[in-house]
Amino acid sequence: LLQPGDIWIMTSANRSDEPIAYKDEDAMERLRAIADAFLIHNREIAHRVDDSVLRIAAGAPRFLRRSRGYVPAPIRLAAAETEAPVVLACGAELKNTFCVTKGPLAFLSEHIGDLANQATLASYEDIIVHYEKIFTLQPRLLACDLHPDYLSTGYARQRAAREGLPLTYVQHHHAHIASVLAEHGEA
């Protein structure tokens, strides 16, 4: 296939700010104007998961984006109680991921993307349902960003009202600090 000097670039199938096209027909329809070729397989993909991005810092890999190959492996929360209620933390609007906790375990979602895109928002909601199903979780508390106009905040408000769940608002800088503490076993 390759001739000397040929360069192939292969990447996940999506345009900027759109969810990955994980069905062959969808990819060929949405991307035919920008892709030279499609490498497909007869093994069906059940769930879209974007690429992980890591960087080597101080000789060790560090996540810039924890996704394919690393999720949904949990992060152990050092300070969490075994009987703590299940919490769904809905994430921000840009570069969204969400987190579901179960006792001392935090299950981070894959990178979902920017929720302003309607298809990405629909994917976000589908992935939440998927996580709740595969981990047999039913949130007892929702947490969302303090920003009132974020679509993830709107999702949390609507779901809390619909299901009668308590809702906690979190300033996003606080959420960032908490996630770094958890990643390093300090939360």
Question: In which residue ranges do the predicted regions lie?
Answer:
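Acidic, glycine-enriched active-site microenvironments
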Residues: 1-187
